[in-house]
């Protein structure tokens, strides 16, 4: 039993005697904590992915302008100068050399359905690209939120590790004093040294985890990887879900940019099919021709106004092949839209259930932490009164440490899950204000005061947070 208790003590954290707290770092006036909204806006400003998506929208708009230009009158001027030699039927002269200048104005007439279908196709593709830009924004917002909450989570866990080490060192010192006074055995001193060593190892891991999380967030913001950030912490309560699962599915189908992009692509491909089927549509031109010649046997100048019609008679099967290609593209776009629809439904369902589960986990973890605190307090009092051996105190402390870590994880997991659900809702889900943190009850006699990390995080910075 003592062996098991020693193994559990490797994760033990929490004080043995006397009140002790570590205050959270207070930001200075010129270092206002950055909120998630501010972090997201900063990511938007420097993201190359978002810049590329924005340029795609500009390109799509330019293609719309090109298609619309095909519906306007376009005038082409052509001038041809030539030098000719000819035998004359009725001399004199029997042979002559003369020059000719021909000026031609050609005006294609924007008649038929194909120019209008080209405009429709370009406009729908512009809508698809615009929806893809919205999707890129949401994806980037999701990445920013994940990195933001990961930094907060790692800061909170680092604070737990720091406080754990301090409290275990304090506990070891107290046991050593009791051993010197003859109130504790030497084995108790050895047992108290185990959680100190474990806490030192855990602190190194927590510092490394926070450094990696900071680098990830800084990379997303285009900042130096080792720069520090001061982040505004969250309330220790998950956000309420304002919709049922069925309502969530319906809402996301109406607002999803990925589905809007897929549907716009279908409409564009349908216009392309209609245009391809008009491969025999004639083309109309209007021409004004002015000819000036030095031919003495013919006219000196000639002005002509003519209308021309170009009608494809045979293209070797090119038109039919283009129709088949357009129809296959349309069928593929329709299938892809169904894939997107199913992915969206499954994604929002998973996000909704996860957010709901995370919220319940926060409540359960809070209850478990409170019970572990009471158990530890009573075990500590029993140890001080000689009723329990030290290994039972270490076991209770290990359970309390695990409960604190689980609660800290649950708080940030719930916040991240709510943000993920909001992203699945195309960022438009109404979000009720979080409930304020409930103050923790006063600590029992002989226990430490409850710090912010013990009741739920309230503020975080790159320099650390309050202890557990």
What are these regions (language model features)?
Residues 26-32, 76-114, 118, 230-245, ...:
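Small/polar, glycine/serine/threonine/aspartate-rich low-complexity segments that form flexible
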Residues 198-223, 367-427:
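Short segments within alpha-helical structural elements
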Residues 1-45, 207-251, 420-468:
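Terminal intrinsically disordered/low-complexity segments used for targeting and assembly
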Residues 185, 344, 351, 386-389:
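Alpha-helical heptad-repeat coiled-coil segments that mediate oligomerization/polymerization in large
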Residues 2-8, 136-251, 351-354, 358, ...:
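Periplasmic alpha-helical coiled-coil/stalk elements that build and connect Gram-negative outer-membrane
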Residues 120-123, 186-195, 390-398:
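Short, charged, amphipathic alpha-helical segments
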Residues 239, 245-288:
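Acidic, glycine-rich loop-and-beta core segments that form the ion-binding/anion-interacting portion
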Residues 41-51, 58-74, 103-121, 130-138, ...:
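A glycine-/polar-enriched beta->alpha junction
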């Amino acid at each position: 039993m003592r062996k098991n208790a020693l193994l559990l003590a490797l994760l033990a954290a929490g004080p043995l005697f006397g009140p002790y707290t570590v205050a959270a770092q207070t930001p200075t006036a010129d270092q206002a904590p950055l909120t998630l909204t501010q972090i997201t806006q900063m990511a938007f400003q420097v993201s190359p992915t978002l810049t590329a998506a924005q340029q795609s929208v500009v390109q799509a708009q330019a293609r719309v302008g090109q298609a619309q230009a095909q519906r306007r009158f376009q005038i082409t001027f052509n001038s041809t100068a030539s030098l000719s030699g000819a035998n004359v039927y009725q001399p004199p002269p029997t042979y002559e050399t003369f020059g000719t200048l021909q000026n031609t104005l050609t005006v294609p007439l924007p008649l038929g359905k194909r120019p209008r279908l080209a405009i429709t196709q370009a406009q729908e593709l512009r809508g698809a690209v615009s929806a893809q830009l919205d999707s890129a924004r949401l994806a980037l917002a999701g990445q920013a939120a994940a990195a933001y909450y990961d930094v907060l989570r790692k800061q909170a866990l680092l604070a737990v590790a720091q406080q754990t080490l301090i409290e275990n060192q304090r506990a070891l010192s107290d046991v050593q004093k009791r051993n010197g006074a003859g109130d504790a055995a030497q084995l108790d001193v050895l047992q108290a040294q185990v959680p100190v060593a474990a806490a030192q190892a855990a602190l190194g891991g927590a510092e490394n985890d926070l450094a990696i999380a900071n680098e990830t967030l800084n990379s997303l913001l285009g900042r130096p990887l080792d720069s520090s950030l001061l982040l505004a912490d969250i309330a220790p309560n998950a956000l309420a879900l304002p919709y049922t699962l069925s309502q969530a599915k319906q809402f996301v189908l109406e607002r999803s940019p990925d589905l809007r992009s897929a549907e716009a692509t279908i409409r564009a491909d349908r216009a392309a099919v209609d245009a391809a089927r008009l491969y025999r549509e004639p083309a109309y031109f209007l021409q004004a021709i002015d000819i000036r010649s030095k031919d003495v046997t013919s006219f000196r100048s000639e002005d002509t106004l003519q209308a021309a019609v170009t009608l494809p008679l045979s293209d070797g099967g090119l038109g039919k092949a283009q129709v088949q290609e357009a129809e296959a593209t349309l069928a593929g776009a329709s299938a892809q839209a169904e894939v997107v629809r199913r992915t969206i439904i499954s994604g929002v369902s998973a996000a909704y259930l996860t957010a709901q589960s995370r919220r319940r986990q926060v409540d359960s973890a809070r209850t478990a932490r409170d019970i572990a605190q009471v158990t530890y307090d009573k075990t500590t009092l029993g140890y001080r009164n000689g009723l329990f051996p030290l290994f039972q105190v270490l076991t209770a402390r290990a359970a309390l440490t695990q409960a604190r870590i689980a609660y800290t994880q649950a708080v940030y997991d719930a916040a991240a899950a709510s943000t993920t659900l909001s992203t699945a809702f195309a960022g438009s889900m109404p979000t009720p204000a979080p409930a304020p943190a409930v103050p923790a009850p006063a600590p029992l006699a002989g226990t430490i005061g409850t710090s912010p990390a013990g009741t739920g995080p309230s503020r975080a910075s790159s320099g650390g947070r309050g202890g557990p």
